[in-house]
Swiss-Prot record:
SUPFAM superfamilies: Globin-like. This is Globin. Heme b binds at H95. Belongs to the globin family. Keywords: Acetylation, Heme, Iron, Metal-binding, Muscle protein, Oxygen transport, Transport. PANTHER family: CYTOGLOBIN, GLOBIN FAMILY PROFILE DOMAIN-CONTAINING PROTEIN. GO terms for molecular function: heme binding; iron ion binding; oxidoreductase activity; oxygen binding; oxygen carrier activity.
Length: 144
């Protein structure tokens, strides 16, 4: 779990991003796939598709809304060690089953603070780094 201070910073940073989660979620995936094109292949709906096709896909909002809902759960429970432990274990098991591992989340960790900043949300780079560090550690523990 994160410290109460880091959890508070995350909540402040995340609130304006999640407030417009449909548009921002889609923008996040487009930014991820622009910086790391191979990431799209981990999503059945986007595998082998061009960025233009992904942007035009009605599935973009469906997928991004699921991602943002899960991220919202992590942000909302970031200071609760018990909840975070079980959530991270479930998340890692699910993602290992999809073939998604720590390397993919290293990519997300490297670009997410900049994505948040691009939306003029309050910076919380160290707190985001810590949250994604927990996710990466859980994936490594799951063998990914």
């Amino acid at each position: 779990a994160l410290s109460a201070a880091d959890a508070g910073l995350l909540a402040q940073s995340w609130a304006p991003v999640f407030a417009n989660s449909d548009a921002n979620g889609a923008s996040f995936l487009v930014a991820l796939f622009t910086q790391f094109p191979e990431s799209a292949n981990f999503f059945n709906d986007f595998k082998g598709k061009s960025l233009a096709d992904i942007q035009a896909s009605p599935k973009l909002r469906d997928v991004s809304s699921r991602i943002f809902a899960r991220l919202n759960e992590f942000v909302s429970n970031a200071a609760d060690a018990g909840k975070m432990g079980s959530m991270l274990q479930q998340f890692a098991t699910e993602h290992a089953g999809f073939g998604v591992g720590s390397a993919q989340f290293q990519n997300v960790r490297s670009m997410f603070p900049g994505f948040v900043a691009s939306l003029s949300a309050p910076a919380a780079d160290a707190a985001w780094n810590s949250l994604f560090g927990l996710i990466i550690s859980a994936l490594q523990s799951a063998g990914k």
